[in-house]
Each structure stands twice: as C-alpha cells, then as structure tokens.
C-alpha cells in the first residue's frame, strides 16, 4: 500500500499528463456518441490495447465540458494497489481535482475486487467511465460483477476510413491522383494496421511486434 503522499504525487503526475493530451489533435470516432454521460450505468469501453479507448473517453468528457477525475491503473507505481486502497485513491482525487461527478478509471480491471468499489460509486450517484483490455472484462464477468449497472462500448483500431481522415487522404474523389493516393494509403494500412499510435511513429514493425506480445501476455 502506498502512503497518501506518494499516491498524491502519482495522481498529480497523471493529471499533468492529462493536460498535455488535451492539446493533441484527435479523430472523433462514432463510438464516442455511444458513451452516455447522463446514465446511472457505468460506461465500459472495451478493446485491445492501444486501440484508443482512453482517448475516446477523454474526448467524450471534454466535448461536453464535464468536470472529472482520472486514474490510470496501468501505471507501474500503482501495481500493488488493492481494492481496500481505492478509497484512499478517491480521497486524493478530491484533493487534486476538487469536487467532481465523473470518475474515469483507466484499466481498473488490474485490481482484484475492483467491481466492489465501482458499485459503491454508482450507489453514490457517481458517473463512472471504465476502460479495459483483457479477459477480466468479458461481458459475462461484467454482468456478474456490476449486476446490470453497466453499458459496454466495444472499440476497435481505426477503420480504413478513419485512417484516411487522420492522414488527410481524400476518401471521395475519383481523379487519377486521388485514387492513386488512396490506394497507396490502403497499402500502408494493410501493412501496419489501424492502431492510432502508428500514425505518429516512424517505424512500425517493432511496435506491432511488441504490441502483439503485450496483448497475448495480458
């Protein structure tokens, strides 16, 4: 268990990272509209690692100007957090963010018994947004753990259309030049896939290799 001073430092670091991400140019995806921020159910975005789950949730919250607190449990400094520590996490979040009605829990499935905390938050009328990327967030488990108090939103890597939007490739033009650019983009898409981070890094082979290994290990 971390003492509250260390916990505050970690969560403050994460808040700082969140501020940096607010300045990024992002692609608004159709799944964003599926996140019902007015619902009393937990909104659970599920997908493979690096498919853009966190970004999708950030965009939904920022778009409507909701005041929220954020925790990324996929942080090595929080590796030993237990379910009984989550109230301390909540206390520190109130200290950092002030009052809030939306709680964004990134990869909370890493914590055994996480659903007990989430259920308590829902009973307190807290709006909860969750992301997850492994077998611990299977539909059957969610139905059991959250007793119907959740809405699942599946998310996949970019479609070719979304890939084109991010790469500023014309998806409608029919001139020889436009079609040639579109075919070239499709060739790249087939080779590297639609993981969002691949659009901003130069070398993709090691990224994909490491990502596949990471997904299989999880």
PLM regions with names:
Residues 45:
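Hydrophobic anchor at the beta1->P-loop junction of P-loop NTPases
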